């Protein structure tokens, strides 16, 4: 184990573990069947499911006791940021979806559940997550504690879908009232994206290196509201917040600047 090797040398001072809200939700197959209700708080009782997040936290705490280093656990929601080739990347997936919808004329429709469309949710900006990691590593009040790590605002996808569409230069389609999974919509995505990439001089012609349809379907298709409470972080001294609209819009701007998605006239 890496921490056994490093811990035995005595040079480890702090270890940060990043997990996520499946600590409260359980595995994908358990969504909607557990007693967890938002807002999720760090002290909630663990679910009666085997969860590798629980195992990771327990191993970390045990090794910290053994070798004398400090630790922190960070539980983000869906992370929005610039990361290509990532298997769990909603922001880039939606950007690719928007470009394909604009190219083909298909409707840019929210693909998830009614509960996610009309309910309350949140996200985590990768930049805020990085700041929370740095804060916890250097703050005595964060020693050996678990913290939620979300932007600090909440929204409904009914409202955010209009923001996302505007940021991608595409019209939002009316929501039909039921899920329309991207894995079903995007069966022809590969040749369409390659055509766009070659014509526009984009850096990545392989759509599977950019879009994770299944993961975005899993996030947006949850049959319940999903958001976390940040009180514990605030009380411990982490004040940062992030406008979730800017999380998406800043990402789209960078994707265009890096020639990952096409330039468009943004509404």
Question: Which residues does each predicted region cover?
Answer:
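A structural motif corresponding to the C-terminal end of an alpha-helix
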Residues: 2-13, 56-70, 236
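Short catalytic/ligand-binding loop motif for oxyanion handling, primarily in non-cytosolic enzymes
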Residues: 23-27, 81-83, 156-158
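Conserved beta-loop-beta element that borders a ligand/cofactor-binding pocket
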Residues: 19, 59-88
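Residue-level signal for the nucleotide or nucleotide-sugar donor/cofactor binding architecture
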Residues: 51, 55, 121-124, 155, ...
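A conserved pocket-lining segment of Rossmann-fold NAD(P)-dependent short-chain dehydrogenase/reductase
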Residues: 79, 95-127, 148
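Mid/C-terminal beta-alpha module of Rossmann-like enzyme folds, strongest
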Residues: 130-217, 221, 229-231, 235, ...
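Conserved Rossmann-fold NAD(P)-dependent oxidoreductase catalytic core, especially the SDR/UDP-sugar
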Residues: 1-52
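Glycine/proline-rich active-site loop of Rossmann-fold NAD(P)-dependent oxidoreductases
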Residues: 67, 81-97, 127, 135-147, ...
């Amino acid at each position: 184990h890496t921490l056994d090797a490093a811990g035995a040398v005595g040079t480890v001072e702090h270890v940060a573990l990043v997990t996520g809200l499946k600590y409260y939700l359980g595995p994908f197959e358990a969504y909607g069947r557990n007693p967890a209700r938002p807002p999720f708080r760090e002290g909630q009782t663990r679910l009666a499911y085997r969860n590798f997040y629980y195992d990771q936290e327990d191993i970390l705490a045990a090794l910290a006791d053994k070798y004398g280093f400090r630790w922190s656990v960070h539980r983000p929601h869906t992370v929005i940021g610039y990361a290509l080739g990532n298997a769990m990347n909603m922001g880039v997936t939606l950007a690719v979806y928007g470009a394909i919808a604009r190219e083909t004329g298909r409707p840019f429709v929210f693909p998830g559940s009614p509960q996610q469309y009309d309910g309350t949710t949140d996200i985590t900006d990768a930049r805020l997550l990085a700041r929370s990691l740095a804060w916890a590593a250097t703050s005595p009040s964060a020693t050996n504690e678990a913290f939620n790590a979300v932007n600090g605002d909440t929204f409904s996808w009914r409202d955010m879908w209009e923001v996302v569409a505007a940021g991608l230069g595409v019209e939002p389609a009316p929501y039909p009232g039921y899920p329309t999974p991207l894995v079903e919509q995007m069966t022809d995505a590969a040749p369409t994206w390659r055509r766009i990439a070659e014509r526009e001089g984009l850096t990545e012609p392989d759509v599977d290196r950019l879009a994770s349809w299944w993961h975005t379907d899993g996030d947006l298709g949850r049959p319940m509201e999903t958001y976390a409470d940040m009180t514990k972080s605030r009380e411990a001294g982490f004040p940062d917040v992030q406008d979730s609209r800017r999380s998406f819009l800043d990402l789209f701007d960078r994707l265009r600047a890096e020639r990952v998605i096409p330039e468009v006239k943004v509404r």
